[in-house]
Amino acid sequence: MKILLANPRGFCAGVYRAISIVESALKIYGPPIYVRHEVVHNRYVVEDLRKRGAIFIEHISQVPDGSVLIFSAHGVSQAVKAQAKARQLKILFDATCPLVTKVHMEVLRASRKGQEAILIGHAGHPEVEGTMGQYDNASAGVYLVESVEDVNQLKVKDENNLCFMTQTTLSVDDTLEITSALQKRFPKIIGPRKDDICYATTNRQQAVRELSEKSDMVLVVGSKNSSNSNRLAELAKRMGKPAYLIDSDADIHADWLKNIKYIGVTAGASAPDVLVQKVIITLQSLGADESIEMMGQEENIVFEIPKQLRIHATEISCS
């Protein structure tokens, strides 16, 4: 039984940046550091940061005056930003992924131009809530669609003044179907100049396609509330392979491995490599031998943390 490792897998640039912001803030300002929502959707990462002094909250009212506050990688609405600015905080850092911010700017532009905006995304996801919360033009409107059926039932005010954008962590295939439906129903609708689904989502889904072709079963390391991790497991199943979304190696069942020759392993963009390594060790204890790294798209994108954190971090390292 052999282990095939998808490439790329695991952390993306936005996740690295968000975690680094929390870690740097803890080092510079000391605990507690308040973070609105889980900084990334991974239980291991969140628990590790919580042990080090991060406090995860859902409402700005939960943050005491004089505190350090960080927005999560998923982004927040204009209303939440206004609430935070109205508080007597020591300092505020925004860990929103720059690629999510790109979509925010698209919605803001639509709002200012009086265009109706249609967001393709999953209801209730914090990224969607933050993105829709950029729109404040009461004379037009912003709408959420999750399926082709939603598109067919959608009612807008002006079919000639529409634009659309997407959540960054969607299924590439599903999104293509929905955008095609939008363009068919609203021929004059305008889409983003560059795809809103982020490079990491696209690359990891392509890697899972290739992994599924060579594997008898696929394990996706990622938490249940991770959108991009769920999409990877769904894609493997669409490829006709048994697929399991696991938080850690403790979730692996030995009976999954019966009659399996090749086990595919990948990880969502918010899952750290330490979890993948533990999965490999557990699989080897259950009879797997070598692990093989598959070829894949090289990623070299880096997003810098805020300048103030970089300066202070340098001062600490030099002292």
From Swiss-Prot:
CDD domains from the UniProt entry: lytB_ispH
Role this protein plays: Catalyzes the conversion of 1-hydroxy-2-methyl-2-(E)-butenyl 4-diphosphate (HMBPP) into a mixture of isopentenyl diphosphate (IPP) and dimethylallyl diphosphate (DMAPP). Acts in the terminal step of the DOXP/MEP pathway for isoprenoid precursor biosynthesis.
UniProt: (2E)-4-hydroxy-3-methylbut-2-enyl diphosphate binding residues: H41, H74, H125, T168, S226, S227, N228, S270
Enzyme Commission identifier(s): 1.17.7.4
Residues bound to dimethylallyl diphosphate: H41, H74, H125, S226, S227, N228, S270
Name the UniProt record assigns to this protein: 4-hydroxy-3-methylbut-2-enyl diphosphate reductase
Family to which this protein belongs: Belongs to the IspH family.
Cofactor binding annotation: Binds 1 [4Fe-4S] cluster per subunit.
Keyword Oxidoreductase recorded: yes
Lineage of source species: Bacteria, Pseudomonadati, Pseudomonadota, Gammaproteobacteria, Enterobacterales
Residues the entry annotates as binding isopentenyl diphosphate: H41, H74, H125, S226, S227, N228, S270
Native source species: Hamiltonella defensa subsp. Acyrthosiphon pisum (strain 5AT)
Coiled coil start-end: none
Binding of [4Fe-4S] cluster, residues: C12, C97, C198
Keyword set, alphabetical order: 4Fe-4S, Iron, Iron-sulfur, Isoprene biosynthesis, Metal-binding, Oxidoreductase
Pfam family for this entry, one: LYTB
Catalytic activity reported: isopentenyl diphosphate + 2 oxidized [2Fe-2S]-[ferredoxin] + H2O = (2E)-4-hydroxy-3-methylbut-2-enyl diphosphate + 2 reduced [2Fe-2S]-[ferredoxin] + 2 H(+); dimethylallyl diphosphate + 2 oxidized [2Fe-2S]-[ferredoxin] + H2O = (2E)-4-hydroxy-3-methylbut-2-enyl diphosphate + 2 reduced [2Fe-2S]-[ferredoxin] + 2 H(+)
InterPro entries assigned to the protein according to its UniProt record, in alphabetical order: LytB/IspH
Active site residues per record: E127
Cofactor: [4Fe-4S] cluster
Gene field: ispH
Quaternary structure (record): Homodimer.
Pathway assigned to this chain's UniProt record: Isoprenoid biosynthesis; dimethylallyl diphosphate biosynthesis; dimethylallyl diphosphate from (2E)-4-hydroxy-3-methylbutenyl diphosphate: step 1/1; Isoprenoid biosynthesis; isopentenyl diphosphate biosynthesis via DXP pathway; isopentenyl diphosphate from 1-deoxy-D-xylulose 5-phosphate: step 6/6
Gene Ontology molecular function: any one: 4 iron, 4 sulfur cluster binding
GO biological-process terms attached to the record: dimethylallyl diphosphate biosynthetic process; isopentenyl diphosphate biosynthetic process, methylerythritol 4-phosphate pathway; terpenoid biosynthetic process
